[in-house]
């Protein structure tokens, strides 16, 4: 059976749900797909299909980043259901790096929790510029309490530069919408309308040389190695030569798909699978970058502006000094690096500082690129590359 080709009829955006564990992100994602399937513009993806890995189903939490797709009247969305479990926030960093906007899910019953704040901070650091709030479980909450939670959330958004007063806050119930309750089905439609109108079409860097950070690597028996990820910039077609940075090899793209549909050309913003000719499965891994040959040079040393999280934001309680060796999350790569704070020598929690970083291995870098700094399973800093040195 031949597959139906992907036809680009509407602008494409990448959107994600984020928020604290058990506030209902995955249920809400399932509800969105159900409401749209009933409108005829998508396929219903049940809750247990979004939480894909068996270990997650057992624990009831989302670890890997799960993608679903759907369409509203005006747009085509790839929707990322992001992990809410603290150990796995690093996965969120790489997922958030490709988002055009986000739906922050906050339980109307519990209000802001530690991860709610951490996710908002991370979203800001990795360049998510627009957040729409879904106050979930609103069917079960007391209205006055829900009003207070809304004020809290607006304050949190304002604290991180998201203009909390103007951000849409929609009261929803993912569970009731899944059960088909008309009032709460309408709330999901209102949420999607808010996303359609509040999250602008981003500028896509279609004219720049092709670049795709590798998220996952798979093997298709008899056909070869497939890499998946979101195209950061440029375009790619079947037959194009590409370079895999990190693996040190050049190859040709022999197949191109999005959500299981073949496509002629992928462009910035698309979530794609690339079939690569003659590349051994173990030669490529998450964190590598597929790019137009010669368009990027991997480097290991750079200067950066870094914000060191305060203890209140879940960061360190003690200062960072030169010689500190945390993990740097850059695109989909996770690399240890040495920090040099120069004459200042010390960076206290809550401060923004300049530093020189020497990574343990070379990765494609350029000024303006955002990254997160983590140690012991928590985010301790977030920064931007200022120059290659």
UniProtKB/Swiss-Prot annotation:
Q: Where GTP is bound, by residue?
A: 19-26, 81-85, 136-139
Annotated Gene Ontology cellular components are: cytosol
Q: Which UniProt keywords apply?
A: Cytoplasm, Elongation factor, GTP-binding, Hydrolase, Magnesium, Metal-binding, Nucleotide-binding, Protein biosynthesis
Q: Which residues lie within the region annotated G1?
A: 19-26
For region G2, the annotated ranges are 60-64
Top-level EC class as recorded in UniProt: hydrolase
Residue intervals of the tr-type G domain: 10-203
Listed InterPro entries? EF-Tu_GTP-bd, EF-Tu_GTPase, EFTu-like_2, G_TR_CS, P-loop_NTPase, Small_GTP-bd, T_Tr_GTP-bd_dom, Transl_B-barrel_sf
Gene3D superfamilies attached to this UniProt entry: P-loop containing nucleotide triphosphate hydrolases, Translation factors
The UniProt record lists the EC number as: 3.6.5.3
Annotated region G4: where? 136-139
Specify whether Metal-binding is a keyword of the entry: yes
Q: Does the keyword DNA damage apply?
A: no
Q: How does it assemble?
A: Monomer.
Instruction: Sum up the protein's function in the record's words.
Output: GTP hydrolase that promotes the GTP-dependent binding of aminoacyl-tRNA to the A-site of ribosomes during protein biosynthesis.
What is the protein name stated in its UniProt record?
Answer: Elongation factor Tu-3
Q: Please tell me the species this chain comes from.
A: Streptomyces ramocissimus
Gene symbol here is tuf3
